[in-house]
Each structure stands twice: as structure tokens, then as C-alpha cells.
Amino acid sequence: ELLPVLNVRENILLPIKLNKTKVDEVYFEEIVKTLGIEEKLTSPVHKLSGGQKQRVAIARALITKPMILLADEPTGNLDRNNTLEVMELFQRCNKELDTTICMITHDQSISEMADKIIHIEDGRIENGID
């Protein structure tokens, strides 16, 4: 959940601040540019659209370069172009940072971009486990 009392930049960098680690400014700039939020960094989050808030949340999730990212419908509020940019960013994080991304989606076209798909129906794994 984004904190409404903080602006976009502060929300994204919150995990870095809490961990008292150094900000990788190059990585930060790459994330915000890819997500199209570089012009919103000083904006209060309560003034953002749903899709913009979603992109800020994705940036915050990625800023610490996690080994594992759990993402529940990460592209749910995004238009097609932003969805593709987010998926490309996830793929880069996977390849360049070795981040494992476990994503839940109901969008067939998004799931087809994954390396592995596990289909769950009525709470049971239907296929995808080797």
C-alpha cells in the first residue's frame, strides 16, 4: 500500500530508507523512466490515477532488487502499452538481476510471456508442475 502522506519518489524509496541502504540512482532512474512516472516524482500519491499508483507500487517493489517478487495482478490497472513495459521490465529483472517473479494473472496474453505457467482452478493445481 502506498503512503498518501509521501510523494511518489518518497514512496518508491521507502524500502531503501527503512533498510538504511544506498540508493542506486541509475537503477532508480531506469525504473521510473521505464514505468513512465519520471514526471510524477514530486506529486502526492493521492493525486495519481489508479494506473499511476500501480506503476509506483511496482517501482517500489523492484527498487531493492529483490531475489523473489510476488506480484498479484501487477498489470491489472494498466493500459496495454504500460502492461507491455512492465512485463519487459520484469523480464529484464529476471535476466539481469536473476529475480524470480511469481505472478498471478487472469490475462492469457500476459501469462504467455512467462517462462513457466501453473494453472490453478478452484484452488487446485490443474497443470504446470513438473
Spans of features found by a protein language model:
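Short coil-to-helix segment of the ABC ATPase nucleotide-binding domain corresponding to the Q-loop/switch region
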Residues: 6-13
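Hydrophobic anchor residue at the start of the ABC signature
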Residues: 58
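Conserved signature/switch motifs of ABC ATPase nucleotide-binding domains
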Residues: 43, 63-64
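ABC nucleotide-binding domain "signature" region
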Residues: 23-35
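Helix N-cap at the start of a conserved alpha-helix in ABC-type nucleotide-binding domains
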Residues: 80-82
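Conserved ABC ATPase signature
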Residues: 44-48, 52-54
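Catalytic Walker B motif of ABC-type/P-loop ATPase nucleotide-binding domains
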Residues: 69-72
